[in-house]
Amino acid sequence: MRNLINFAVLIMTIFIVSASGARETRMMEQTCPVFWPMVPCDANKCEQMCRDYYGSVPSYCNRIGTPIAECACSLTPC
C-alpha cells in the first residue's frame, strides 16, 4: 500500500512539472518569431499556418531557396 501511495505521488509530481514546463515553453515562444520548417516556403501556407496556431500575427518566409527554408510567425518584436 505504501508503494502505491509513493507511486501516485511520483506520477502527480511528474505531471505537474511537465505541465509547468510546457507553459514556460509557450511563454518563451511569445518573445520572438517562431520558426517552422517549410521547404519550399509558400507565403500563403505560411500565413495560414501562423493564423491557425497563433491567431492574426504577421508571417514571412525565412531563408527562401535553401534546403532549410522556414516559415516565421512574428508574435512580438525581439
Curated annotation (Swiss-Prot):
A GO cellular-component term linked to this record: extracellular region
Gene Ontology biological-process annotations: defense response to fungus; killing of cells of another organism
Keywords noted in UniProt: Antimicrobial, Disulfide bond, Fungicide, Plant defense, Secreted, Signal
Keyword check for Secreted: yes
Family note: Belongs to the DEFL family.
Name used for this protein in its record: Defensin-like protein 201
Annotated localization: Secreted
Keyword Disulfide bond: yes
TM spans (from-to): none
